[in-house]
Amino acid sequence: MASTSVSQGRVALVTGAGQGIGRAIALRLASDGFDVALNDLQANEANLVSALAAIEAVGRKGCYIFADVSQETEVEQMISKVVEELGGLDVMVCNAGISLMKSFFDTTAEDFDRITSVNLRGTFLCYKHAGKQMVTQGKGGRIIGACSGTGKKGQPLFSAYAASKFGIRGLTQVAALEFGPHGISVNAFAPGPVKTPMYDHFETIIGTPKGVLEQELNKTAALGRIALPEDVAVVVSFLASKEASLITGQTINVDGGIVFD
């Protein structure tokens, strides 16, 4: 795993860093020795302020930047701001994403466009402009995307979400091939259910008593439990490290053994 001595002076940018998996990734990378730029929407400013304070508390530099990852101009400006504030970009974690639980027939074209705009288009734009910055710097880098178990095995009620996450696997493989000659690796992580605010939202929609859904999901995992955000952050920490220098084009499951390749 990455260590402070190895990662000292390197810069990471994490999108969707206000809460859940993104926040856990940002804090883990800071503990690994990275200076960390945080991205989210302005509505999540309080969460970003809190995360930045936690990063600075472990002696790392940081900043936060508002941007909608589905908008190309905002992504370009975000990456330029990271370089201006922290001196470069070594690791890009494209974590921002949204979900939707709806039957296939009830999912509208507008629903589909909204989900894929953030999840798939947003990942494409972050891969593209982070990759360009890393090529300009000339010292390689790490790009890491957020796939899902639903990006490997479709699930009922998640048609738009599944489409976006299957697409991320394809983008990851193509980017790995094109960016590889520049010393840039591109991988993704694929969590199953994770105890996050998004998970809590689905529990509310389903209407099960608190804890019942988790018990049922735990039964589907070979290791008997679903993930915490920190479980995902550990995998990202490794993919961001120099020890992962020969891994690229891969989408790594982090689900306790729910989906197998």
Swiss-Prot record:
Catalytic residues as annotated in Swiss-Prot or TrEMBL: Y161 (proton acceptor), K165 (lowers pka of active site tyr)
Source organism superkingdom: Eukaryota
Class of the enzyme per the UniProt entry, highest EC level: oxidoreductase
InterPro entries named in the record: NAD(P)-bd_dom_sf, Sc_DH/Rdtase_CS, SDR_fam
Residue numbers binding NADP(+): I21, D68, N95, K128, Y161, K165, V194, T196
Pathway annotation: Secondary metabolite biosynthesis
Function: Short-chain dehydrogenase/reductase, part of the gene cluster that mediates the biosynthesis of melleolides, a range of antifungal and phytotoxic polyketide derivatives composed of an orsellinic acid (OA) moiety esterified to various sesquiterpene alcohols. The first step in melleolides biosynthesis is performed by the delta(6)-protoilludene synthase PRO1 which catalyzes the cyclization of farnesyl diphosphate to protoilludene.
Additional notes on this entry: Armillaria species are both devastating forest pathogens and some of the largest and oldest terrestrial organisms on Earth. They forage for hosts and achieve immense colony sizes via rhizomorphs, root-like multicellular structures of clonal dispersal. One genetic Armillaria gallica individual localized in Michigan's Upper Peninsula stands out as exceptionally large, covering hundreds of tree root systems over approximately 75 hectares of the forest floor. Based on observed growth rates of the fungus, the minimum age of this large individual can be estimated as 2500 years.
Family: Belongs to the short-chain dehydrogenases/reductases (SDR) family.
Entry protein name: Short-chain dehydrogenase/reductase ARMGADRAFT_1018421
UniProt organism field: Armillaria gallica
